[in-house]
Amino acid sequence: MIDPVQTKRHSDENLKEWKIRICSNKDIYNLNWEEIKELINKETGESKGESAYRKWFNNFIEGVEYQRERSDESNNSLLELELKKVEIMEERKKLQAVKHEIHKNTRVKGRTELLYENVTEAIEKVGTLPPPSFYPLNKNERKRAAVLGFGDEHFGKQFKSNNNEYNEQIYLQRMNQILSETVEYIQKENLDELVVLNGADSVEGMALRVSQLTALQYGFIDQVIKYSRYKAEWLLELSKHVKIKYIHIPSANHTELRLHNTNRSEMPKEDVERIIATYIHDVLKDNERIEVPLYDEGIVDFKLLEFEIVACHGHQIKNKKNAIRDISQMKRKFYDYMYISHFHHGNMLTVGEAATHNIQVIQLPSVMGSDEYSDSLMTGAKAGANLSIYESGKGRIIQYDYILN
């Protein structure tokens, strides 16, 4: 298949240079002689057969080889100069391939990385955020820890449905409510450390379906920039009261880029959740109370007290009841708890028991809440978040449910 970017005649190429480059790179460009014939005839207006160009190029190669073998020192210098021209043309092509790589896979990777660089460059202009003035940490004497979980924020979406309304201002109000209630629970439970788990689908995106575009308040890049800045500032404020381990799930269905018409989860690492997490990591790196580990895989795990916890967005889960078992088999590791989001309503499912605690799947509610789609299915639920208290030797003992609308 002819790649018009690779085979286009450059503005600084004469006809012969272009023909030599096309024929020399026949295999690299995945061309056959019929396709080369079409390209050259279209460029020159001629109607020659493929054999004419094939013979012409073979003669050119034979001439080059003859000159290499038989020419004297001065002719060899001229030949080297011609060969150098070919090398320079190739080097120029490599530089131009920042956006258009020769092979399909490397082209996809290059374009994705370029998007990452452009977005990261845009949001990094704010620089690092200086640490705030910290309040003294509580004294945790009961060997307790907590996980604040939320997901499906879908920042950038705006709508009004039967029981819910959503836009940027409402999103900010809900996150402020989560912050306020969390600080209250931190003081109540004497917590000094907190895992903040973001279940992803942080922004609405625009890769799923055309109907998304009608509900967007901002373009995709603006969604990422605004969300990343706000989330970093939100964590900064929360760190005044508690030490934070911020875990951001790096893969979801709304934030996949889905380049070249790829299907869902076909390229799970090409996801702007990774850009968001990296930005938050970088701008908060000077804050001694915030740790932001970065993950490449869509399924992440971490340890809380003696409990092993696994988390993912949830779009890849087919059977919630068997999810812990299946992931434990895949990773060759036993898990006590699992966190998922994606389903836009909170739930808790006990799927087994250990010596001191139940084995549970915790399904996080959505910060966005119900919308027109969930109304049509009659599956809506209140916008919310979830704070779970864990105690050593007992497991998950307390749950605080946040109702945000």
Swiss-Prot record:
Q: Which UniProt keywords apply?
A: Coiled coil
Where is the organism placed in the taxonomic lineage, from the top? Bacteria, Bacillati, Bacillota, Bacilli, Bacillales
- Which positions are tagged coiled coil? 72-101
> What is this protein's name?
SPbeta prophage-derived uncharacterized protein YonJ
Task: Give the highest taxon in the source lineage.
Answer: Bacteria
